[in-house]
Swiss-Prot record:
S-adenosyl-L-methionine binds at T81, D102, N130, A131. NCBIfam families: MenG_MenH_UbiE, PRK00216.1-3, PRK00216.1-5. The keyword S-adenosyl-L-methionine applies. It comes from Rhizobium rhizogenes (strain K84 / ATCC BAA-868). This is Ubiquinone/menaquinone biosynthesis C-methyltransferase UbiE. Belongs to the class I-like SAM-binding methyltransferase superfamily. MenG/UbiE family. Keywords: Menaquinone biosynthesis, Methyltransferase, S-adenosyl-L-methionine, Transferase, Ubiquinone biosynthesis. GO terms for molecular function: 2-methoxy-6-polyprenyl-1,4-benzoquinol methyltransferase activity; demethylmenaquinone methyltransferase activity. Methyltransferase required for the conversion of demethylmenaquinol (DMKH2) to menaquinol (MKH2) and the conversion of 2-polyprenyl-6-methoxy-1,4-benzoquinol (DDMQH2) to 2-polyprenyl-3-methyl-6-methoxy-1,4-benzoquinol (DMQH2).
Length: 258
């Protein structure tokens, strides 16, 4: 579970991959990972998901079914490169507005460049901020999305409570994340791929295997589907459920602020 715990000396610790680090240290370590991979982030997702992340993201947008309405506002957290936000805007016939929030300026820079090339800048706002301290008023958004980002947040419970706070009544939370594989044979194959192939592919692509090693380890430390659903309920959300993709390699969690 990626939650804060009390260390032997009384300080607060959390997981950074398979390591335990001080609560205040994790964010800096995660930031460094994403500074290194920002320009190759989509390639990274292809490597980590064997290309399946594209289908999973399409399914996420279908589940969201964004309104074709200029008043419809979505907050996409940890969405720096814009992949989810672009899909949301396009699915709304370029009518909805998406705020892309990320704590990493390098990721946001990539997203802003891509948005300009796609001529989507009128539908997007890019904000550099922390998921645990959202710079928005309560009841500001119709939907909150986060894809492959929640496991990198030091205090997931705090981020979920912030999501609840900024959503309007009737607003929806959607979290797409790598999860616990529920088919034993697939689990063995995916584990071998994750711990052997992914870091080596990462080194070949970026010249550095370490960021990919962390990302693989962070998947294993993330709560399983049922435990994460419980965390979402504890943050205040109703009608919480999840859908497994590809045998549980990824899962889409949904909750509503009612």
């Amino acid at each position: 579970m990626a939650e804060s715990r009390t260390s032997a000396d009384g300080g607060m610790e959390t997981s950074y991959g398979f390591r335990e680090v001080a609560d205040g240290e994790k964010q800096g370590l995660v930031n460094e990972v994403f500074h290194k991979v920002a320009k190759r982030y989509d390639i990274m997702n292809d490597v980590m998901s064997m290309g399946l992340h594209r289908a999973w993201k399409d399914a996420m947008i279908s589940a969201l079914n964004p309104r074709k309405d200029p008043s419809y506002k979505v907050l996409d957290v940890a969405g720096g490169t814009g992949d989810i936000a672009f899909r949301i805007v396009e699915a709304s016939n370029r009518l909805a507005h998406a705020t892309v929030l990320d704590i990493n300026g390098s990721m946001l820079g990539v997203g802003a460049e891509r948005a300009a090339k796609k001529k989507l800048t009128d539908n997007l706002t890019f904000v550099e901020a922390n998921a645990e301290e959202l710079p928005f008023e309560p009841n500001s958004f119709d939907a909150y999305t986060i894809a492959f980002g929640i496991r990198n947040v030091p205090r997931i419970d705090v981020a979920l409570k912030e999501a609840y706070r900024v959503l309007k009544r009737g607003g929806r939370l959607l979290v797409l994340e790598f999860s616990e594989v529920d088919l034993p044979l697939l689990d063995r194959v995916y584990e071998a791929w994750s711990f052997n192939a992914i870091p080596q592919f990462g080194k070949a692509i970026t010249g550095d295997a370490e960021p990919y090693q962390y990302l693989v380890e962070s998947i294993r430390k993330f709560p399983n589907q049922q435990d994460f659903a419980t965390m979402i309920r504890e943050a205040g959300f109703s009608r919480v459920n999840f859908t497994n993709y590809t045998g549980g390699i990824a899962a889409l969690h949904s909750g509503w602020k009612l």
